[in-house]
Curated annotation (Swiss-Prot):
Species per Swiss-Prot/TrEMBL record: Streptococcus thermophilus (strain ATCC BAA-250 / LMG 18311)
Catalysed conversion reaction: adenosine(37) in tRNA + dimethylallyl diphosphate = N(6)-dimethylallyladenosine(37) in tRNA + diphosphate
UniProt xrefs under InterPro entries: Dimethylallyltransferase (IPR039657), IPT (IPR018022), P-loop_NTPase (IPR027417)
Signal sequence coordinates: none
Gene label: miaA
HAMAP family, per the entry: IPP_trans
Phylogenetic placement of the source organism: Bacteria, Bacillati, Bacillota, Bacilli, Lactobacillales
Coiled coil: none
Role noted for this protein: Catalyzes the transfer of a dimethylallyl group onto the adenine at position 37 in tRNAs that read codons beginning with uridine, leading to the formation of N6-(dimethylallyl)adenosine (i(6)A).
UniProt site positions, description: Interaction with substrate tRNA: 101, 127
Keywords: ATP-binding, Magnesium, Nucleotide-binding, Transferase, tRNA processing
Family: Belongs to the IPP transferase family.
Protein name: tRNA dimethylallyltransferase
Cofactor (UniProt): Mg(2+)
Amino acid sequence: MKTKLIVVAGPTAVGKTALGIELAERFNGEIISGDSQQVYRQLNIGTAKATPEEQAAAVHHLIDVRDVDESYSAYDFVTEAQAAITDIVSRGKLPIIVGGTGLYLQSLLEGYHLGGKVDQNQVLAYRSELEQLSDQQLFEKIDSLGIEIKEINRRRAIRALELYRFSDNLENTETCYEPFIIGLDDERSLIYDRINTRVDKMVELGLLEEAKWLYDNFPEAQSARGIGYKELFPYFSGEQTLDEALEKLKQNTRRFAKRQLTWFRNRMTVSFYQISSPEYPENVIQDLAIFLNEEEGEK
């Protein structure tokens, strides 16, 4: 029998953390972070990490598991998430994965890994084709497909497009999970308003100080490339005003949210819920109760 688990996905700033905690309390669950930035210790504000109070309300896994100068990959996530799921289930609890890093979630749930089915000649031919494109053309292609990459540069763009193109030919190990994937969504303008408000709130909470510490100590680290930090570096170096840097941060976050939604719609089987609906979140609770074959709210 496959292990049932819940996934709370969606773009940034739609309330994934709050819903995850509510579901953990309602269905006797524990949360696994599915966010590529929340693994880093000392980066709390810019990553929108669950607060100490929120973490006290439900057990959280895969938060604060790396130092800021360490790397983290989809492979690391899959390996550590699988171990966390096994541990959670062994104690009779429900695994609830909460996060917006689509590649991580898909890699875990669909069991993909690079294998012998990929024709390397085809990969090389496609790479040659991509090399003929300008940077702008590559980045437009990335955006149109909803692909998430850590850093917008040519090398990463080409690699991401290769993985996207040949993902259907990757070896697909039989997954042992039966997920119910909740996708949180709303009107685009409302999501953008929430993003803008959240950035302003992050600044009030100390984002500038957190980003400055990262800039002073680990400017080349993988963690420093995440949205929320890199946009502020030109301000610290005197290349931009604070208003310009914050506007860029809001703009990049809005674009990232759009890419996240595109990924979840095109690459995964997701049940979407409008967070502004009067029925939310009770409609989620009801659907999960059915999925888990239990009376509403009981475990």
